[in-house]
Amino acid sequence: MTLRVLGVDPGLTRCGIGVVDVEKNRRATMVAVGVVGTSPDESLDQRLLLIATSIDDWLDRYEPHVLAVERVFSQLNVSTVMGVAQASGVVIAAAARRGIPVALHTPSEVKAAVTGSGTSNKDAVTKLVTKILRLDAPPRPADAADALALAITHAWRAGSGAAIATTGPGSQSLTPAQRAWAEAEAKARRAR
């Protein structure tokens, strides 16, 4: 069976979106790629609405089995982190409304899966995404290439169980850190 993964590189100014079909033999094919751009001159609610509407369109058009979203990580620029977190929330909610599982991947996980090194730069990721997907030209801007890399990463890391091994609703597969967190929360609730 072919696994269809919609990758999202979330951002408030540029939100990269890429759809990839991956065969059991790991052969990946690009279905679609794009970037949703919003203007800093617009109000926050209008920017998030544009991202939400665009994601809804992509989900309805391409019907992915799973979403792969870049995990928000701490940066020095708090406003950038907030924008990424807000865009991520809109994307995750859109998937949840449709019952589509969502998997979160860190930037270093994506770099390691696509290039073999978790410290690769964006140019290396773009170059290898172009090669893996057998594209005539690199996807631009970098947000588009990153979205495709997220989709590839999820399919390759999760293997044949990629649609199941997610952090979404009904997930039976937790990372060790997620399992430890859940156990700590359960223990704290019992102690009350």
Swiss-Prot record:
Mg(2+) 1 binds at D9, D143. The lineage of its organism: Bacteria, Bacillati, Actinomycetota, Actinomycetes, Micrococcales. This is Crossover junction endodeoxyribonuclease RuvC. The RuvA-RuvB-RuvC complex processes Holliday junction (HJ) DNA during genetic recombination and DNA repair. Endonuclease that resolves HJ intermediates. Cleaves cruciform DNA by making single-stranded nicks across the HJ at symmetrical positions within the homologous arms, yielding a 5'-phosphate and a 3'-hydroxyl group; requires a central core of homology in the junction. The consensus cleavage sequence is 5'-(A/T)TT(C/G)-3'. Cleavage occurs on the 3'-side of the TT dinucleotide at the point of strand exchange. The active site is at D9, E70, D143. Belongs to the RuvC family. Gene3D superfamilies: Ribonuclease H-like superfamily/Ribonuclease H. GO terms for cellular component: cytoplasm; Holliday junction resolvase complex. It is an enzyme of class 3 (hydrolase). It catalyses: Endonucleolytic cleavage at a junction such as a reciprocal single-stranded crossover between two homologous DNA duplexes (Holliday junction). Its main location: cytoplasm. Keywords: Cytoplasm, DNA damage, DNA recombination, DNA repair, DNA-binding, Endonuclease, Hydrolase, Magnesium, Metal-binding, Nuclease. Mg(2+) 2 binds at E70. GO terms for biological process: DNA recombination; DNA repair. GO terms for molecular function: crossover junction DNA endonuclease activity; DNA binding; magnesium ion binding. Homodimer which binds Holliday junction (HJ) DNA. The HJ becomes 2-fold symmetrical on binding to RuvC with unstacked arms; it has a different conformation from HJ DNA in complex with RuvA. In the full resolvosome a probable DNA-RuvA(4)-RuvB(12)-RuvC(2) complex forms which resolves the HJ. Its cofactor is Mg(2+). It comes from the Bacteria. Binds 2 Mg(2+) ion per subunit. Its EC number is 3.1.21.10. Residues 163-192 are annotated as: Disordered. NCBIfam families: ruvC. Residues 182-192 have a biased composition (Basic and acidic residues).
